[in-house]
Amino acid sequence: MSVQAYTNTPNLPNLIHSESITNSPVFIPNLRSKSDNKHRLNTSEELPFTKKRRATKHFLKMEVSAKISEPPSSKSVEFGRHLNMRHDFSELLEQPLTTSKTRVFKSFNEKLKGKPQLVKSDKGVLPLNKQSDILNSYERVLSNASVDSALDKKAEVDIIPFDKSVMEPKNITFNDKSGLTKFGNSNSYETTYSDSSNYHTSTDSSQYNDQDDHVYDDTNDGTDDDINNNEYKDDESSSGSESYERDEDVDEEEEEDDDENNDEGDDEDENENDELRSENGSPNPSAAVINEQENMNMSGIEEYDETNLLNELGRIRRGNQFQSLASSILSSGNLENSDDEDVSLGPQTYRFNSSFHPFRSAFSAPGVQFGRLLEGIKDFSDPTVQMLSLQELSEAFAMSTEDMLVGLFSTDSYIAAFSEILSGRNYDFGEVSIQLMLSCTTCVSNMMEALPLCMAKIAYSPIVRILCERMFDMQYIDIAEQALGVLERLSKDFGICILEHRGMLAALQYFDFFYTTVQRTAISLAANCCKFLDESNASAAEEIIPLLSNILQSSDTIVVSKAYSCLETIIESLKTSPNIIETIISEDLITTIVNALTNSTSQNKSMHLQVQLLHIISSLCQSSSALILPFLNHNLPDVMYEMLCGIPPSDTSHQADMITMQSLYYCPIELIENLLRAITSLLPKNTSNLSDEFNTKLYRLNSILLTVVMDIYFIVPLHDIRSLAVTTALKMLCSIRENNLDGLVCSLPLSSFIASILNSRKSDNFLKRDALEMCLFLLEALPNVYSSLFIREGVVQEVGFLVRSTNADMKKIKLSISFSQNKSAARHEELKNLSTLKSLAKEFLSNYKEENLENSTLVQLKQLSKHLLSETKQDESFSELAKIFQEGSNITSHELLHSGLIHNLLLSLKKFGSSSLRTFLLAMNTCDEREVLEFGNGPLVSLIFCLQNLLSTVENFQLSTLPPDTENAVDHVFSRQFKLRLMALPGSRIRPPFRSLVVSINGLATIRTLDNYLHSRISVRNETGRRFSILREAGSLRESMSGSSRNSSGDYTDSMSQDAPNHTTEPSERRDSSTSSHFEEHFVFSLMGKKVPRNKTIFRILYEYIQLSDDHTLDDFWKTPVPIFYGEPDCIHNDMKGELNYENETEGFSINIREILDLLSILYYGIRDVHTLFPDKHFRGNIENILTDFSNWKLSAKLNRQLEEQQLVVHGCLPSWCISLTSAYPFLVPFETRYLLLQSTAFGLSRSVSFLLSRNPELSKNESSSILQFVSLHRQKIRISRKKIFNYALHLLATYAASENILEIEYEDEVGSGLGPTLEFYTSVSKEFTLNSLDIWRNDQPNSKFVYQASGLFPSPIPLLGSSPENERKISLFFALGQFVARSIYDSRIISIQFNPLFFARNIPLTISSVAKVDKGLANSLRYLEKLIPGKNPTNAETDIKLEDLHLDFTLPGFPSIELIPDGASTPVTTFNVSDYLNYVIDYTVGKGVQQQLEAFQNGFSSVFPYTSLQVLTEHELVTLFGTVDEDWSYATLMKSIVADHGYTMESPTIQRLLTLMSQMNFQEQRDFLQFITGSRKLPIGGFAGLNPPLTVVRRLNEPPYVPDDYLPSVMTCVNYLKLPEYSSSEVLGSRLSKAILEGQGSFHLS
């Protein structure tokens, strides 16, 4: 191995790439001449070092390149290129030289595999059995050199793997070819080797003749290196290292200071060095005889001379092994001193400023002078010399930095030479000339990298023109590719130079011939050059537009994105020149843009591309109105509609349009904003001279998008976008031709839209101004329509109120200005805006007179509403109301709200109960047949529609968002730490160090976590002497203290974070109470004088604090601490009893809104239960279609938009209306949205975060994401026995029901585990709960094993008279059932229990109708008995049937053991007590007889998570969720949902046979198949499409001699995997699958 140690010598070329430069302090040796032996360098005063170090450690910087050679033998005397290694000496930047020796030789020893080593140096052959010998050898070289020679010295050391069998002891010569001063006239060493591992060396002579005495002082080595009288001494009895005679003038105190300033890395290296010394013993340097006749032949080591040095370093660089030299050169850069101080180094003085660099003089060394290289480059007579010079110069540039090269040479002559070579004028094109051009281009590229300042000279030199010509010629693609790289670098700052030589065209004309990476370079060059376009060079853009059109068809998304960036930049640069834009933009390009936008919508491509395309369209249309029509001709409005709504536009009913509006909330805000701007750009400024074709297209645009723009106003909460929507709507109206206006706007709720803007509290003056301008336009265009409509919609009344409020505001501002000395321009501007608004309002009101404000419809509705409260006039009033709301009714929201109709109708329906509802529904019946009910397209639907419009108009539910200045990235918000200043409450007994404590805590942590943290830090003694327990929850908190140091304000600062907090919203309170026994007392916390709940997260507390205070934003708490007081509970004052709570249950629920919602609720449940209200009538039509009309699309969109604020959802910061509205009126919002709300909010923090990650997979991909540490969901594996599965299930529920872990089930003696066995467990236990033997359900088939009830499972009543163990058993089973059902939702498991909807009803009315929902036969009997009550039914008064003949007693029908009253079995039912009998039966059936069971179920459910969370779902939806099966097994659905893989495709015959077989299965076969495949007997929500992972069918291979028909299919239930052999026929497939299902049930084994 050849080791070359390069010092900071002028002879060494500085060949370092600029990217490897780092800022580090440097090392300078203690170089002292003999005449200045006692003077040291004062580094602390004269050099800008980062640490105070001795000068002996700050200048010497070495790089070792090692080449391992094999030992010489008779067969191979010289080999040496097996391994090139360069050790990284960058650690020398921070440690003294000798400390780093151990690291160097560790690497050497690993390569040499521990063989005995010899060192061949300038002193001869030495045994290397000590780690530091090699460095000591060249230390001695430096120690005997003068200052000048030390700076110019290249020391060479050879390490020879020693093999005793082939290597004879002999004298080895060393020829010092460095051209430096010789060290002594003769140096003879006699070396002997023994068989032992230790080498013994005797010294014959060690006399050195040198005039200068230099001492290398290593203060960190811990040993003394002595050189006395220039004599080398071998002292075997020394303490383990060579010793030099120390200078007697060395200051001991200075050495101590030096040691104290060493960093930890030095100590580590010293320890490491000490360990190696102890292993190897003390160094035993040997002597060698220097014989100048034999030079290095024995070791086979290649010598380095100055001519091949650059090439060798280049090879090392290409091996990526030059970082240490880079660090070395960088460290030299730190020697610059802004004050240009002189530093004394012995007898010479060096100036450490920008003009000095320790390596710069290397370039003037013999053999590598830049002048010589320039001469070689200009030598056109010898291409070889040119090639070598270019390569050498290129390597020099590649390994250099700007600091190393500045000032060494002039770049002008080199640029001229490069231009001459690239021009090719001096030689014919051939292989040599091509290689010269390639090398020259590489040299130019490296030169720009090393010297960025030369780029300007290159840009304005002939090089750019020549390179562009080379790309135009395209004779040699290699030259073109390199030219592209050079020009791309130049294009960022000097694109104008490339444009002058048509560089963009040159880069793109042969685009298809390049590789993808080169294509990206070419398009990047064009994109950069486009930024320099203007009218003067617009021809360059015109040249490349056709090429860009082709490039836009590329399959590389990066290339396409860059191409659109080119186009976007071109348009922006030339947008003030519409003539040029119209010239360069072709019809084909417009087609390409629209098609790209269409494809991006249908293929769900990146939103960035969509925004980019929309911006291009906006810029083009704004620049030239002539381009609008071509875009409209390509159906751009249809594409925009699909981008907003998710589906293409249709010309169907307005109801269908409203349903599509629900998709608006899926559209990102950024995309909505750009779509609005694009729509605005498509509206021409001057519409007076438009052609008929243009007007037709504009009409199509407005008819499709105007209603969407109006809906955006209601859906998007951001004010800027709402304002943009109103402005866009106004411009759209103004663009419509008057003769077309009537047909368009009459079908749109424009008047109510305007009324909403004027009535909104959130509307500013600019929004109201646009609304007034819209009013004036409509009045002028369609006075006959809107003059009366504005009265009926209440617009006139709102404008009148606006005038009065504006007058009051103007008076306040004028008064403020008159009393204020500061005449604020803003106040004057505000006054001006109000004046404008007032003028528009007065202009509008001038069209109306007081006597013309009468509203006949409103008067009629007021009279009708008065009659609704009279029971005698109900029939007449309801009939008249039905006539008013007949199809086509035009009652406005304003009329409906102010007539009192809603209020009186609601009172009437509530006051007279179900009889009034029956009368109302009969009046709304549109069918003339007596026994038939029909409501479709009748007055009832019209009433519902009017109520929904009114609700959308008057509702004012506000959306919560993060503050605009808050970074809204999900992971960013979760990863940030909040600062809290915890201050002790007055009177607290907390010790002084903790009375003011600043902590940094994640927002996901709770106050309970903070409490536990403080208990672990603070010990407080209360009045009785009890101490707070010092608890540490393992893994719950990780404290990273900053030394518990005080800050400037005297506070202690801690940092807190959670590893795995176990927190949920409601369950946490139960766990908190269960663990509170461990605490003697909890701390209490207060903010703003209010107690802070322990279960709330820090983020939620601070967010509520922001809502209550207008002086702070969320970002403030990331910068400055928020004060929170804490202390013992007895420190809380009487005025601090209330809790900090921003929730307002009545927020947004005005009296009008509440009445509208209540009326809708009565109508909804009345229609849903119409069969119960009218058991003797037949309903015609689909009830579900009417029930969907109760869904309010605006509120649905609002809630979905709110749920997109995932940070607020996770922290429980949703507005209160989200839960209260969906709980009280679930019919307003679709099931999918409410179920999403349930999953996001009901299961606690950990589940909420986990659900967030499932919806945002990109967050969980990064394992270092801080959000992952808060997902403490572990899997609890439980092994049970199948034989007693129900008993095991009950025990499991009693033990683990409230566990936050995910429960997974395994079975004894079975290998299966995971999802499959777990799902089967839930399916099996579901079935066990329906066993007839449990006797807990009503049952229509008492002799069957399992309960069957046609109407669904409902509890059988239990006796109320007395208590018994049997009752307790049943109640406990319902408690366990509640736990089981809750656990299935909590862990997202599928169960199959067919409940009765009444089981989940919130309030069960004690009526025969309720009994009918449970037992129709019993309800019919009760109705019959009801007719026998005297006076109840006059038509049957004279019947011959007597109750006494029925022989009824006071026992519950169907349950003779249950007595309704004491001694009820012997008490007959008579006409006198039949009414009591009916009441008792109803109460026992659906009332008190089942109350305890239902309460037990709810309590068991709440032990997992709150049962009240289910209120967002209706009872029918819960029945569907837990048991009702309504699945789509059609062939088409299966084709869309099933995945074929690993040997199959969807076209494979076996797959086709399987799908056909599945689509033909009956109900029982479907259940068995699902349980075989998934472990569950029913599909999840969404059917087959809801399976996750999807059902996948793969091919099962056969092993000869067996054939596929010999195998049964097998499954992997955990991943829904079906391994299906390729059966020969459908019959074989069906039989084999049936057999597998039959034999595979009830076990999980390996297939």
UniProtKB/Swiss-Prot annotation:
GO annotation, biological process: proteasome-mediated ubiquitin-dependent protein catabolic process; protein polyubiquitination
InterPro entries found in the cross-reference section: ARM-like, ARM-type_fold, HECT_dom, Hect_E3_ubiquitin_ligase, HECTD1/TRIP12-like
The reaction(s) this protein catalyses: S-ubiquitinyl-[E2 ubiquitin-conjugating enzyme]-L-cysteine + [acceptor protein]-L-lysine = [E2 ubiquitin-conjugating enzyme]-L-cysteine + N(6)-ubiquitinyl-[acceptor protein]-L-lysine
Ranges of residues in domain HECT: 1294-1647
Biased composition (Polar residues): 192-209, 1051-1065
Keyword Signal: no
One GO MF term: ubiquitin protein ligase activity
Lineage: superkingdom: Eukaryota
UniProt-annotated catalytic positions: C1614 (glycyl thioester intermediate)
Biased amino acid composition, Acidic residues: 218-228, 245-273
GO CC annotation: cytosol; mitochondrial outer membrane; nuclear speck; nucleus
Compositional bias of kind Low complexity: 1039-1050
Compositionally biased residues, Basic and acidic residues: 1066-1076
Enzyme Commission no: 2.3.2.26
Keywords on record: Transferase, Ubl conjugation pathway
Region entry K-box, spans: 1183-1257
Stated role: E3 ubiquitin-protein ligase which accepts ubiquitin from an E2 ubiquitin-conjugating enzyme in the form of a thioester and then directly transfers the ubiquitin to targeted substrates.
Family classification: Belongs to the UPL family. K-HECT subfamily.
Name of protein: Probable ubiquitin fusion degradation protein C12B10.01c
The species this protein was found in: Schizosaccharomyces pombe (strain 972 / ATCC 24843)
Organism taxonomic ancestry: Eukaryota, Fungi, Dikarya, Ascomycota, Taphrinomycotina
